[in-house]
Design a protein with these regions (language model features):
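A cross-kingdom marker for long, charged
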Residues: 238-296
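Alpha-helical transmembrane segments and their juxtamembrane interfaces
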Residues: 15-16, 58, 282
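Hydrophobic helical h-region of N-terminal Sec-dependent signal peptides
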Residues: 9-21
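Structured, acidic catalytic/metal-binding patches in enzyme active sites
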Residues: 24, 31-244
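Compositionally biased, intrinsically disordered low-complexity regions
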Residues: 7, 14, 147-150
Length: 296
């Protein structure tokens, strides 16, 4: 369920649903990476899962030490921007179909049947999404389904670290604006949006426990399994996969190499776990640049 899992965090704040129990895995040791900078300061990278069951067992000693040492915490985006009226208006403007266009009209009968069945699994009615574009419908299905499995959008690692950091007066930096993240989906051609929606619906129907598998892989530091679940599952929508993964990883790697490596600050970088797993991950790209990264 790589496509939808990776997309789920973008709309999580907008979802309201009743959660059922989820058997949370025992958190052993999520993967963590460290770069020793030439001046003696450090860069630590930790993968976030944007939707988690309740609990904070992921706060390992290594992560706590990195948090305490960090002069700056770096995250994908400032999550509080989702509450800004300009972002809300931008999302509303770009998530709705033009007048006279419905989701039914955009899908073939077979595609509609698949999407409707997935919406059933998520306790959603197809009619509730008729006015929305396929990309937004895909994310809504994913997040709602995850919440019904017991995952809480307010319990993500990134949100928890951001709340702690702001309470403790930590400095923050962000790789992207929320609008930049939304634009990844907004700028997809319509046919690619439909592919994204239908593939995600099929994944919910055929592999309903993928989110649980992802959290288990993350909780035990199984980077190879994270890559398999989150990144290799995106092959059905190559343009979206490139926009969500490789292109962004390359930009972040460049920023780390050109700026973070050269100043006197220690950094704690928190990004989605899928960005740190696989051949096109930030970790792999940093190593390709000759930067020594300690960790798996």
């Amino acid at each position: 369920m790589g496509l939808l899992k990776r997309a789920a965090g973008f709309a999580a704040a907008a979802v309201m649903a009743s959660a059922i129990a989820f058997a949370a895995p025992k958190i052993d040791e999520p993967a963590i990476w460290t770069i020793q900078k030439p001046n003696g300061t450090t860069i630590t990278l930790f993968g976030s899962v944007h939707l988690l069951p309740d609990g904070d067992g992921w706060r390992t000693k290594a992560l706590k030490d990195a948090y305490e040492a960090a002069d700056v915490i770096v995250m994908e985006t400032d999550l509080t921007e989702m509450g800004n009226s300009d972002v809300a208006n931008y999302l509303a403007k770009n998530s709705l179909n033009p007048p006279g266009v419905t989701l039914t009209k955009l899908l073939s009968p077979e595609q509609k049947a698949t999407v409707e069945a997935a919406m059933d699994k998520a306790a959603m009615s197809f009619s509730s999404m008729e006015g929305y574009k396929p990309w937004f419908s895909a994310i809504q299905i994913s997040v709602t389904y995850a919440v019904l499995q017991g995952f809480d959008p307010s319990q993500g690692v990134d949100k928890a670290i951001e709340a702690d950091g702001k309470s403790d007066g930590k400095a923050f930096a962000y790789f992207e604006k929320v609008r930049e993240q939304l634009d990844v989906f907004i700028e997809l051609p319509e046919d690619e949006q439909i592919t994204f929606l239908v593939l995600g619906a099929k994944e919910i129907l055929t592999r309903p426990d993928e989110m649980e598998k992802l959290v288990t892989a993350w909780a035990t530091g199984n980077v190879e399994e994270i890559d398999k679940l989150m990144n290799r599952g995106m092959e059905g929508s190559p343009r979206l996969a490139r926009a969500l993964l490789a292109d962004r990883n390359a930009r972040w790697t460049k920023e780390i190499g050109e700026f973070f490596m050269k100043d006197k600050n220690s950094y704690l970088i928190i990004v989605g776990a899928g960005h740190l797993a696989g051949d096109e991950s930030v970790i792999a790209m940093l190593r390709d640049e000759g930067i020594e990264v300690e960790g798996p």
